[in-house]
Regions:
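Short Fe-S-cluster ligation motifs
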Residues: 410, 418, 738-768
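Local cysteine-cluster metal-coordination motifs and their immediate loop/turn environment
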Residues: 572, 707, 711-735, 746-761
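Cytochrome P450
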Residues: 1-444
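FNR/FR-type flavoprotein reductase catalytic core
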Residues: 531-689, 695-698
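Short flanking/linker segments adjacent to small metal-binding domains or redox-active Cys/His motifs
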Residues: 166, 428, 621, 697, ...
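Ferredoxin-reductase
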Residues: 446-542, 559, 593-595, 606
């Protein structure tokens, strides 16, 4: 069924629909083994779904196409995920039979309806609240292994640590008795070669022998656990669940999962860690950044997983005629969905080949898969990688790759990591020799997808300049003089001010990235942010900054703009007005304030925009007549406003007769209050892509419930202001409480902000 659907004999070579690149594709040799993503750049650009005669598979390479395959585990069956990609010899098959090898269904390759009941039954040990208990063990092992070579000045990170520690963690997580760990360690790699590799005929019997022994010994250890399943670990937990749900968790399933679990929890993390260290040390500036600021480690891990993850591809079986990326795929076809290629798709990741640890959507990577077959152990892997990086950046920040080493990889289609990573350093420069107390410092481990609050950069305060009564302009730049990130009118940044985080709109020139400017009003009722800026912040100080991000975007297709700013709301508006002028658009600006002395940026505004500006001062008695201004709708006109709530409310009332979505506003603050269980109700959230239904308590946000259930989702402000936690809605009416969506978007009911919005009824369904 997986044969090429093209009659090559009839077509000969001329005109054959299989392109030269597709015909030449061989995942076992050459470019794919060196760099899978780079080797398939031609496919992402020209032929995102192609048939490989060499492999007998359809190959899928773009992000959205790969994700759509993951999303539908009925149409695209995972049943062949563990099928041997290369047929084995009769001798190897006989060798496996000698050991009663019966590796069958696991979490990875099981179809519905059996898969999800088992996944739900066995999920609990993987949730964040349970994984916390493993952190001390991971830290202890990491410290012990680094201690062994810290004073030697040279190490092979793979042989001396990264292969061993994840395996030991995996065995502890599974609950394997200490006395059986060494034996199981010796068998693990054979499973990878047996399933995803192309061993030579003469190697197949030896590989099969090792796999058979692995299977047999795993069964022996499992039987030992059955005699006393009261201990900690996933396998004792599974045995206890089996006693309650014997039809869901069967004997054969536990045996298969015992073996598969060791490999899954071990090799993927070991390879991902080796890839990460190579990538970071090859990008020295980035390595030095995380050494200086370990709070960047969680997102550095995500970017490493995206850029150079350990899982290159998965396989699926097509159960019905379908179309992927505009290409008709017949029933029975086999798919190779190349996640490493998807992770480098420019259509989803800007400048996808760049290694950017501040990339805000790094955690969209598909290295852990997606949906109902997403890796259950993803957060254990994240924990290990974060702790590894923390230990090395703290203890051996001066470590470097040994020059001119050749990186080799175990040839296979799906899993990759260097066989060796050789590093060297001068032990005399080890920081702990001068200051042993650094060994006591600990960076918090982020269990789960990193929040955008973890993605910060250090900026220097160049100046704090008064620009109106009670308003200062703060000028920020990169300490090393590098350009700051690009931004567009309406963008804001998040600035950490002491223990607080506050959002401020950018009001400088987007074309001048040597610095940013924000303007801050001192608020008498401030929770501390503006007070800190006005009373503490000085030139020469450094701050942590995140962003820029833009949830207040200017519509480039509008024919005309009306800008209305109230007080400090001028900051995003002035950047928008500058852009309108630069692009030759028709526009007018209405700037409202209590008194001209309190109106920031007034001189620049009038100098740059002249008669386009109208000043409305309460003290001067010329308040803006909003109903008169907006009495007559004008085709092609878009209204943008930032200011106090009373201004925004008045504008909303005055534009009720305008075309929908003519008015765009940005709020200063959120009006969200703490959830009051007496006034809220519990409800269900169906996660259609993951095949799960979770409960949201009356005093719990959807965001909190998602994270407690091991579902990755971003967030930042968690006040309904920034839009980071948006999730697609498939069914059910949403009680929208955010300040992000427009009236039309709310009415369409296609998305919700999970940090604040809730279900109107008993259930909603999300595309997560």
């Amino acid at each position: 069924m997986s044969a090429c659907p093209i009659d090559h004999k009839a077509l000969q070579n001329m005109g054959c629909p299989v392109s030269a690149n597709a015909a030449a594709f061989d995942p076992f040799t050459g470019p794919y083994q060196v760099d899978p993503a780079a080797s398939l750049r031609w496919s992402r650009d020209e032929e995102p779904v192609f048939y490989s005669p060499e492999l007998g598979y359809w190959v899928v390479t773009r992000y959205e196409d790969v994700k759509s395959v993951f999303r539908d585990n009925i149409l695209f069956s995972p049943s062949i995920a563990l099928e041997k990609i290369t047929p084995v010899s009769e001798e190897a098959t006989a060798t496996l039979a000698k050991y009663d090898y019966a590796m069958a269904r696991t979490m990875v390759n099981e179809d519905e309806p059996a898969h999800m009941p088992r996944r739900r039954a066995l999920m609990d040990p993987f949730t964040p609240k349970e994984l916390v208990h493993h952190e001390p063990m991971v830290r202890r092992l990491t410290r012990e292994y680094v201690d062994r070579f810290i004073d030697t000045g040279r190490a092979d990170l793979v042989d001396e640590m990264l292969w061993e520690v994840p395996l030991t963690v995996a065995l502890h997580f599974l609950g394997v008795p200490e006395e059986d760990m060494d034996e199981l360690r010796s068998y693990s790699i054979a499973h990878t070669v047996n399933t995803w590799g192309r061993p030579a005929v003469e190697e197949q019997v030896a590989v099969a022998e090792a796999v058979g022994k692995f299977w047999q010994y795993a069964g022996t250890v499992l039987e030992k656990m059955r005699k006393d399943p009261s201990g900690h670990g996933w396998m004792p937990f599974g045995i206890r669940v089996q006693q309650e749900q014997p039809d869901v968790v069967t004997d054969s399933y536990l045996h298969s999962m015992m073996m598969a679990g060791i490999v899954a929890a071990h090799e993927t993390t070991a390879n991902a860690s080796a890839n990460a260290f190579r990538l970071l040390l090859e990008n020295r500036r980035v390595w030095e950044e995380i050494c200086a600021d370990p709070s960047l480690i969680p997102n550095a891990v995500e970017e490493c997983l995206r850029h150079s993850g350990s899982v290159a591809a998965w396989r699926r079986l097509v159960t019905d005629d379908t179309t992927i990326g505009g290409i008709d795929i017949p029933k029975g076809s086999k798919l190779l969905i190349v996640t490493s290629s998807a992770n480098h798709d420019e259509r989803h990741f800007d400048n996808a080949d760049d290694f950017d640890i501040r990339r805000e959507n790094s955690s969209d990577h598909l290295t852990f898969g997606y949906g109902s077959h997403q890796c259950m152990g993803k957060n254990l892997a994240r924990m290990e990688m974060q702790i590894f990086l923390e230990e090395f950046t703290k203890r051996i920040p001066h470590m470097e790759l040994v020059p001119d080493q050749e990186f080799t990889y175990l040839p296979n289609t799906s899993f990759r990591g260097p066989d060796h990573v050789l590093v060297q350093w001068d032990p005399a420069k080890n920081p702990e020799r001068a200051d042993p107390s650094i060994l006591d410092a600990r960076q918090p481990v982020k269990i789960g997808e990193p929040s955008k609050t973890n993605i910060s950069r250090t900026v220097t305060v160049d100046a704090v300049t008064p620009v109106a009564d009670g308003v200062v302009r703060v000028t920020l730049s990169d300490p090393s003089g590098k350009p700051l990130p690009k931004w567009t009118p309406g963008s804001h940044i998040d600035v950490e001010l002491g223990d607080l985080s506050r959002q401020y709109s950018l009001c400088s020139d987007p074309n001048d990235l040597s610095h940013y400017e924000i303007a801050v009003l001192e608020e008498p009722e401030s929770r501390g942010g503006s007070r800190y800026v006005h009373r503490t912040l000085q030139a020469g100080h450094t701050l942590k900054m995140r962003g820029p991000r833009n949830h207040f975007k200017l519509d480039p297709d509008a024919q005309r703009y009306v800008f209305v700013a109230g007080g400090i709301g001028i900051t995003p508006v002035i950047a928008m007005a500058d852009h309108a002028k630069a692009t030759g658009k028709d526009y007018e600006i209405h700037y409202c304030g209590r008194d001209v002395a309190t109106m920031a940026l007034l001189d620049r505004l009038t100098a740059d925009h002249g008669d386009k500006v109208e000043i409305h001062s309460s003290a001067a008695g010329n308040r803006l007549d909003i109903p008169a201004l907006l009495a007559t709708p004008v085709d092609g006109t878009q209204i943008y406003s930032c200011g106090p709530e009373r201004l925004l409310t008045a504008l909303e009332e005055a534009t009720a007769h305008w075309p929908e979505d003519s008015l765009h506003v940005e709020h200063f603050t959120s009006n969200l209050a703490t959830l009051d269980p007496a006034n809220e109700h519990a409800f269900e959230v169906e996660l259609r892509d993951s095949g799960l239904t979770i409960q949201v308590a009356a005093d719990q946000t959807v965001l909190d419930a998602l994270r407690a259930s091991n579902i990755d989702i971003q967030s930042d402000c968690e006040e309904g202001l920034c839009g980071s936690c948006e999730a697609p809605v498939l069914d059910g009416e949403v009680d929208h409480r955010d300040m992000v969506l427009t009236k039309t978007e709310r009415a369409q009911n296609k998305s919700m902000m999970t940090c604040c919005s809730r279900a109107c009824g008993k259930k909603i369904s999300l595309a997560l």
